């Protein structure tokens, strides 16, 4: 991982209202959407793993809205872990025994090299018994979508096909960043699958 995820990084991209990528309002809307779709698909939501939990916006949302959900948050940043209360773990090297109904991995994968991405997906799949929400900016996103004044562009720029290939073996795409672990108990209509 090329980036130092220190206080300066978090101030620049997440804590400053003037320069942050996302704030509470955006993550609240995203969390409602993700959990709403899981409810629509009939999935249980008892345990959540948040990989690269950063400033803890998902953690805060679950605490306010679904406080009975068992929530576990990880980050590689010593700063984020101390300030926001996460476990310090690297998903490319760590695989826990617990299984989760939802694994969240938002904005993490582009920091890994290719082998790190492969290990991260394998580890998340092993711990997922339901859904994965994955957000990873792609080379096209970097060219055409992101606000470069607010987005850390010091990442591995990869085509979407790279992530789709990695996920295909272990997850079924459902659209909007949501996937379901292969071999799970859910069946989806053709047009629900991404």
Predicted regions located by residue number:
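Class I (Rossmann-like) S-adenosyl-L-methionine-dependent methyltransferase catalytic domain
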Residues: 1-98, 112-119, 123-194
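A conserved beta-strand element that flanks and buttresses the S-adenosyl-L-methionine
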Residues: 104
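Hydrophobic adenine-recognition pocket in adenosine-nucleotide-binding enzymes
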Residues: 108
């Amino acid at each position: 991982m090329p980036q130092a995820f220190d206080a300066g990084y978090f101030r620049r991209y997440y804590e400053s209202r003037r320069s942050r990528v996302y704030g509470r309002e955006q993550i609240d809307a995203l969390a409602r959407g993700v959990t709403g779709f899981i409810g629509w698909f009939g999935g249980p939501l008892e345990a959540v793993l948040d990989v690269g939990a950063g400033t803890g916006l998902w953690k805060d949302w679950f605490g306010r809205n679904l406080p009975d959900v068992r929530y576990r948050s990880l980050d590689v940043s010593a700063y984020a872990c101390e300030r926001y209360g996460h476990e310090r773990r690297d998903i490319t090297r760590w695989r826990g025994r617990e299984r989760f109904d939802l694994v969240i991995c938002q904005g993490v994968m582009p920091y890994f090299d290719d082998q790190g991405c492969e290990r991260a997906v394998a580890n998340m799949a092993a711990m997922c018994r339901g859904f994965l929400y994955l957000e990873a900016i792609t080379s096209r996103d970097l060219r055409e979508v992101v606000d470069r004044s607010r987005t850390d562009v010091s990442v591995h720029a990869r085509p979407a096909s790279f992530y789709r290939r990695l996920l295909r073996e272990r997850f079924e795409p459902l659209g909007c960043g949501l996937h379901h672990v292969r071999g799970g108990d859910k069946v989806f209509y053709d047009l629900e699958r991404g």
